[in-house]
């Protein structure tokens, strides 16, 4: 699984997120660290992952629904393939729970 070119920086980032989330400062830390465009990209990636895990919609249709490129959908699909199946099952469960709340 590819994490980062610089694992030390990645681990520092993850640790900062853990600390911020544990202290209820998730909005502030993500706003500080991510530009509006990056936040939009993360939100789009989450939508892509959700639709890919649903498996009822073809990738081309996901691309059209989300008004994004085929390459963006492919990158999401390829990353899913690198993750442990147990983790992806957990992600799907979380997404399904979130969908019930909405």
Curated annotation (Swiss-Prot):
Disulfide bonds: none annotated. It holds the Pfam family Trp_repressor. SUPFAM superfamilies: TrpR-like (SSF48295). GO terms for cellular component: cytoplasm. The keyword Transmembrane helix does not apply. Keywords: Cytoplasm, DNA-binding, Repressor, Transcription, Transcription regulation. Residues 59-82 bind DNA. It is found in: Cytoplasm. It comes from the Bacteria. GO terms for molecular function: DNA-binding transcription factor activity; sequence-specific DNA binding. GO terms for biological process: negative regulation of DNA-templated transcription. The keyword Repressor applies. This protein is an aporepressor. When complexed with L-tryptophan it binds the operator region of the trp operon and prevents the initiation of transcription. Homodimer. Belongs to the TrpR family. This is Trp operon repressor homolog. It comes from Pasteurella multocida (strain Pm70). The lineage of its organism: Bacteria, Pseudomonadati, Pseudomonadota, Gammaproteobacteria, Pasteurellales.
